[in-house]
């Protein structure tokens, strides 16, 4: 099968789908309705789906994974853009017959996986021969999707962790992503330092990727119409992350920094440490990182976060118990102790 696919990814004739029922007709034909619980919103205007696909770059001969194709509007645009191998991952059984119709219209080009993108092993979905070394140009593999709102944030966090670890879709190299998000989430992903929308998501995405806001789709373009507009965002993983620490450690530092958005950054950062040693260790970390404790979280640059992550990693290497510490767990134990009257054990058991 891979041989046929690789032959297809060489020099290919331009491909256009044959005449097909419109997306609206497919929805009627298979009695499809958007499910509110799955945050489904259909994009019926093929001019808009074509515009999304153009943001991914040249797809002629490319391998593509589409997330949540639904009735197949974006799928058609990807196929018409010349993708040689399109793998679609769809959780909702109702959409499979319509996608099979498309598969028959594009022989050998469309593969359908009935499954959940949050658990699907994309590293097994494409041939290893398409891989590129991380430091070189990105592989000819793209992830494209009109994401349901309820899955978009957990999914991009999961993919950012895969990116940091070079696993999943990024086992092939610096795989590019073109995805839709609620406009507010898109703004957070691309927000610059000191902007109102700057958040944990901004820092986590931007330390690993070049993140580009492409364009906004008005809510009225979707069926059913969501209450918000939608932003299209393109991600290209960086050859060298801007913070050279494990993803979980970076995420913990950034999450704590944004714990109190409107207060000085030290208020959230000190919660990285057990209460008994909090002032001492927080001061040591901020001093070592050369970060002004009175900056607001939104004012911290990627350089600040790099210095903070490095300083925190240094403290954890001196006292390994710090890495396991979570302030919410200490609060939970305190509540239990208040109820039962038991003496409080040290949390976590730390060195001197």
Residue ranges and their predicted role:
Residues 2-256, 307, 311, 319-325, ...:
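Catalytic cores of RNA-modifying enzymes
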Residues 228-231, 235-237, 243-292, 297-304, ...:
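An accessory alpha-helical subdomain
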């Amino acid at each position: 099968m891979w041989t046929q696919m690789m032959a297809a990814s060489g020099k290919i004739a331009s491909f256009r789908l044959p005449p097909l029922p419109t997306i609206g007709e497919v929805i009627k034909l298979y009695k499809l309705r958007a499910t509110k619980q799955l945050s489904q919103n259909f994009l019926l205007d093929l001019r808009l789906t074509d515009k999304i696909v153009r943001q991914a770059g040249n797809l002629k001969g490319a391998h593509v994974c589409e997330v949540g194709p639904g009735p197949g509007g974006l799928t058609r645009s990807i196929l018409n853009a010349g993708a040689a191998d399109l793998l679609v991952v769809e959780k909702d059984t109702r959409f499979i017959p319509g996608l099979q119709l498309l598969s028959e219209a594009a022989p050998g080009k469309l593969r359908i996986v009935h499954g959940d993108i949050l658990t699907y092993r994309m590293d097994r979905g494409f041939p290893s021969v398409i891989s590129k070394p991380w430091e070189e140009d990105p592989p000819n593999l793209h992830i494209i999707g009109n994401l349901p709102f309820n899955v978009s944030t957990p999914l991009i966090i999961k993919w950012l962790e895969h990116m940091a670890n070079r696993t999943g879709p990024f086992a092939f190299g610096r795989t590019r992503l073109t995805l839709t998000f609620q406009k507010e989430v898109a703004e957070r992903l691309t927000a610059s330092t000191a902007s109102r929308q700057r958040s944990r998501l901004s820092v986590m995405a931007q330390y690993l990727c070049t993140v580009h806001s492409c364009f906004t789709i008005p809510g009225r373009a979707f069926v059913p119409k969501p209450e918000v507009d939608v932003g299209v965002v393109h991600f290209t993983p960086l050859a060298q992350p801007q913070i050279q620490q494990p993803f979980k450690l970076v995420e913990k530092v950034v999450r704590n920094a944004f714990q109190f958005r409107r207060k000085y950054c030290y208020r959230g950062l000190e919660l990285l440490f057990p209460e008994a040693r909090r002032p001492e260790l927080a001061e040591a970390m901020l001093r070592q990182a050369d970060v002004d404790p009175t900056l607001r979280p939104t004012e911290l640059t990627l350089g600040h976060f790099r210095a903070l992550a490095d300083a925190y990693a240094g403290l954890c290497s001196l006292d390994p118990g710090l890495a396991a510490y979570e302030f919410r767990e200490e609060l939970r134990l305190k509540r239990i102790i208040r109820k039962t009257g038991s003496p409080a054990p040290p949390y976590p058991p730390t060195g001197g």
